[in-house]
């Protein structure tokens, strides 16, 4: 099957610092979706975070496209995709990823999600386990309620006019001055100022700002993150999973990485000690090496409707427990259909732990 987008509109212009690959467009359910497609081989789906776009992967796409098909979409309401009044829930985004892949003729993928995109990745694996081979979570949401206070405030009713003011040209100029100071003071938030300000720059457009608020309020309220994966981690078994986190993440605390790893027997954890919320931007070469090692040393998960049913019936009381050294073949999940996220994974690679032992942690020396 040839994707309709491959025969459709292609925008070959790209500003400095963005991906050198053309942005392609395809219409799904009446809305234009922007995406980047590069390379040939097993498919890798890269999902960005809230307020961001496929350009967050710009440095990685050329590296990952050597021997793989890389698909990096702009989520609905983000980047160059349409920004309608619509469903901006985690589940809605997961369905959007399924539909985009269907149009492009791609059946199965390894999915990599950053921040909000991690929640979408988990939801995709939960809703469509037959289409997911592996899951990679990068500074993902959906673990505990903790999140940066500014995001909690932005989720409150009445925050729209304030956000509109913050995205005016004069205030953005002040923001750049403040962020330079944050960087100079070596604060955790200062490590990500360029990426955070890039996100803020995009919100000066009314439709982008409205989509940002709808997306945020679908998963965050005044108390923090309103959805969690931890009560459904048992639903994933046999899905190779990798967790990557920045050691100085000021948006979602690094402690969430270890909480998530403990809930996912067999998963790998990589801590980028000097990175903030965007480890894939801070050190793209190391990120590529970690991801390539994970991909080459794990087998794609296989789907079994019977195993899936047994996991659901077990309610987590009887997880798949094979002797150490054996290879788990059951199917794994991610977020819950009601918008909650869930994830647990057991991979069969050296360095991972099996049989209920604590997973291995890898970080910078």
Question: Would you name each region that the model predicts?
Answer:
Residues 1-43, 66-68, 106-107, 193-194, ...:
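Alpha/beta-hydrolase fold catalytic core
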Residues 40, 247-249, 274-276:
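Acidic beta-to-alpha connecting loop that harbors the catalytic carboxylate
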Residues 205-259, 271:
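Conserved serine/cysteine hydrolase catalytic core
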Residues 272-288:
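Catalytic histidine-centered segment of alpha/beta-hydrolase-like enzymes
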Residues 126, 134-168:
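Flexible "cap/lid" loop of the alpha/beta hydrolase fold
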Residues 261-277:
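Catalytic histidine neighborhood in serine/cysteine hydrolases
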Residues 29-31, 36-38, 72-116, 148, ...:
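Active-site loop/oxyanion-hole signature of alpha/beta-hydrolase fold enzymes
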Residues 31-80:
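Conserved HGGG/HGGXW glycine-rich cap/lid loop of the alpha/beta-hydrolase fold
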């Amino acid at each position: 099957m040839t994707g309709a987008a491959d025969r459709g509109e292609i925008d070959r212009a790209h500003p400095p610092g963005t991906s050198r690959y053309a942005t392609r467009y395809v219409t799904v359910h009446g809305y234009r979706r922007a995406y980047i497609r590069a390379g040939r081989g097993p498919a890798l789906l890269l999902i960005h975070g809230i307020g961001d776009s496929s350009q967050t992967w710009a440095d990685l796409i050329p590296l990952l496209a050597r021997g793989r098909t890389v698909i990096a979409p702009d989520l609905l309401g983000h980047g160059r995709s349409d920004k309608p009044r619509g469903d901006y829930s985690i589940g809605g985004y997961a369905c959007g990823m399924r539909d985009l892949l269907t149009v492009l003729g791609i059946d199965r993928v390894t999915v990599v999600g950053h921040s909000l995109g991690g929640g979408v990745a988990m939801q995709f694996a939960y809703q469509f386990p037959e289409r997911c081979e592996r899951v990679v979570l990068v500074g993902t949401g959906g673990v505990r309620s903790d999140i940066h206070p500014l995001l909690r405030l932005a989720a409150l009713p009445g925050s729209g006019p304030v956000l509109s003011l913050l995205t005016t040209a004069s205030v953005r100029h002040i923001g750049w001055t403040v962020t330079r100071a944050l960087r100079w003071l070596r604060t955790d938030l200062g490590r990500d100022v360029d990426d955070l300000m890039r996100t803020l720059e995009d919100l000066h457009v009314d439709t982008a700002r409205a989509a940002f608020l709808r997306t945020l309020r679908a998963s965050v309220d005044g108390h923090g993150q309103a959805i969690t994966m931890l009560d459904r981690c048992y639903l994933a078994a046999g899905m190779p999973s990798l967790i990557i986190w920045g050691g100085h993440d000021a948006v979602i605390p690094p402690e969430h990485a270890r909480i998530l790893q403990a809930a996912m027997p067999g998963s790998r954890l990589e801590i980028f000690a000097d990175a903030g919320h965007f480890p894939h931007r801070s050190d793209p070469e190391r990120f590529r090496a970690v991801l390539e090692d994970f991909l080459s040393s794990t087998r794609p998960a296989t789907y079994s409707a019977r195993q899936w049913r047994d996991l659901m019936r077990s309610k987590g009381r009887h997880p798949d427990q094979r002797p150490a050294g054996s290879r788990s073949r059951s199917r794994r999940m991610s977020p819950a259909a009601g918008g909650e996220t869930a994830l647990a994974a057991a991979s069969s690679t050296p360095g991972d732990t099996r049989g209920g032992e604590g997973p291995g942690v890898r970080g910078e020396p």
